[in-house]
UniProtKB/Swiss-Prot annotation:
PROSITE patterns: CARRIER. Belongs to the DltC family. One of its GO terms (biological process) is lipoteichoic acid biosynthetic process. It comes from Staphylococcus carnosus (strain TM300). This is D-alanyl carrier protein.
Length: 78
C-alpha cells in the first residue's frame, strides 16, 4: 500500500469519517472532523502503525490542517 493511502486510511479510522479520503483538502479541525482528543489518538496511531514519532509539542494545527498537509508533514518525518 502506498504511504499516502496508509496515512489517509489511518486518518479516516481515527476521524471515523471517510470525508478525509474523499476530500483531502478539507479543513479537519475547522470542520470539526477531528477534535483535540482524536489528535492525540492520531499521533499515537501514526507512531504505532507507521513507526513515525510525532511529539504533541511538534504538532502544529496549521501545518496539519488538511489530510494533504498531514501526508506532506509525515513524508518529511519518515
Amino acid at each position: 500500500m502506498e504511504f499516502r493511502e496508509q496515512v489517509l486510511d489511518l486518518l479516516a479510522e481515527v476521524a471515523e469519517n471517510d470525508v478525509v479520503k474523499e476530500n483531502p483538502d478539507v479543513e479537519i479541525f475547522e470542520e470539526g472532523i477531528i477534535d483535540s482528543f482524536q489528535t492525540v489518538g492520531l499521533l499515537l496511531e501514526i507512531q504505532n502503525k507507521l513507526g513515525i514519532e510525532v511529539s504533541i509539542m511538534d504538532f502544529d494545527r496549521d501545518e496539519w490542517a488538511t489530510p494533504n498537509k498531514i501526508v506532506e508533514a509525515l513524508e518529511e518525518l519518515k
